Amino acid sequence: MPPSTVNQEVNSILFIKNLSFKITAEEMYDLFGRYGPVRQIRLGNTVQTRGTAFVVYENVQDARRACEKLSGYNFMDRYLVVHYYNPERAKVDGQDLAARYAALEQVKQKYGVQL
């Protein structure tokens, strides 16, 4: 399928959630590499990002096939959640997170809680 006929939100970068915290990059390459050449995999390594990853494919068609096949796939006793990366959504989520942290700080100050 030519790139011009692919839905605009479909791209070569996938965002994966609900991964086992024990998964390795090698296991990710083995799983996602079944659907085409993978350029890069970034596993979340902080408390907030553990269990997530970004997978970058060489081309959009391979990413699309992986997204279709692996969404809901049971891997390491976890059902994977696979989405196309959306930079606009990432921006909004980050802003919401900052607002939630600010609200949490206000509540902590109000009740004198220190963590």
UniProtKB/Swiss-Prot annotation:
Subcellular location: Nucleus
One GO location term (cellular component): U2 snRNP
Domain RRM span(s) in chain numbering: 12-87
Entry keyword set: mRNA processing, mRNA splicing, Nucleus, RNA-binding
Region (Interaction with pre-mRNA branch site): 9-22
A GO MF label: RNA binding
Record-level GO BP terms: mRNA cis splicing, via spliceosome
Organism domain of life: Eukaryota
Cell membrane keyword on record: no
Function recorded in the entry: Necessary for the splicing of pre-mRNA.
PANTHER family assigned: RNA RECOGNITION MOTIF RRM DOMAIN CONTAINING PROTEIN
Protein name from the UniProt record: Splicing factor 3B subunit 6-like protein
Organism, as annotated: Schizosaccharomyces pombe (strain 972 / ATCC 24843) (Fission yeast)
